[in-house]
């Protein structure tokens, strides 16, 4: 099964009334171990490097976000400043000049969406939430 259509849907869900998308890169990883579910070849793929996926998964699996609080959230080799976590399911982070990142867990996956600098992270949050909630509704 290809999960890449979920990335297209996530980008579409982030569009505002004018049709501007507020997600430029995204991916889905497994909650157990952080392995990529989506392919790096997708036009909007967020490409996690090295231990970034496993480290993100470890924090969400344990619901201990101390590593994010002290060392930031790392994605694509960039360090994003941790802003907050909500209900042990959602993490928001930002890097000046590079945009923001929203991460939300379902039962078995973590959905990540990147908002470009100048974009509306609120739209990114909504789009990531739609996909994560859909996966959750499927028991995933």
Swiss-Prot record:
Question: Would you say which domain of life the source belongs to?
Answer: Eukaryota
Signal peptide (residue range): none
Query: Subunit comment for this entry?
Result: Occurs in many kinds of cells as a complex with monomeric actin in a 1:1 ratio.
Which species is this record about? Suberites domuncula (Sponge)
GO process annotations (BP): regulation of cellular component organization
Chain's role = Binds to actin and affects the structure of the cytoskeleton. At high concentrations, profilin prevents the polymerization of actin, whereas it enhances it at low concentrations. By binding to PIP2, it inhibits the formation of IP3 and DG.
Q: Which Pfam families match?
A: Profilin (PF00235)
Q: Which PROSITE patterns match?
A: PROFILIN
* Name of this protein: Profilin
GO molecular function terms listed in the Swiss-Prot or TrEMBL record: actin monomer binding
Q: Which GO terms describe its cellular component?
A: cell cortex
- So where does this one cross the membrane? none
Under InterPro entries, the record lists: PFN (IPR048278), PFN_euk (IPR005455), PFN_sf (IPR036140), Profilin_CS (IPR027310)
The text of the family note is: Belongs to the profilin family.
């Amino acid at each position: 099964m290809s999960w890449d259509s979920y990335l297209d849907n996530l980008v579409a869900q982030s569009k505002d009334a004018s049709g501007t998308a507020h997600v430029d890169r995204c991916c889905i990883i497994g909650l157990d171990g952080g392995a990529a579910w989506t392919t790096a070849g997708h036009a909007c793929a967020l490409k996690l490097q090295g231990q970034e996926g496993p480290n993100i998964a470890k924090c969400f699996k344990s619901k201990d976000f101390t590593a994010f609080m002290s060392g930031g959230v790392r994605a694509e080799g960039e360090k994003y400043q941790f802003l907050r976590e909500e209900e042990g399911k959602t993490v928001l982070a930002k890097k000046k000049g590079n945009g923001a990142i929203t991460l939300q867990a379902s039962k078995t996956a973590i959905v990540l969406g990147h908002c470009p600098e100048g974009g509306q992270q609120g739209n990114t949050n909504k789009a990531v939430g739609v996909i994560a909630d859909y996966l959750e509704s499927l028991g995933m």
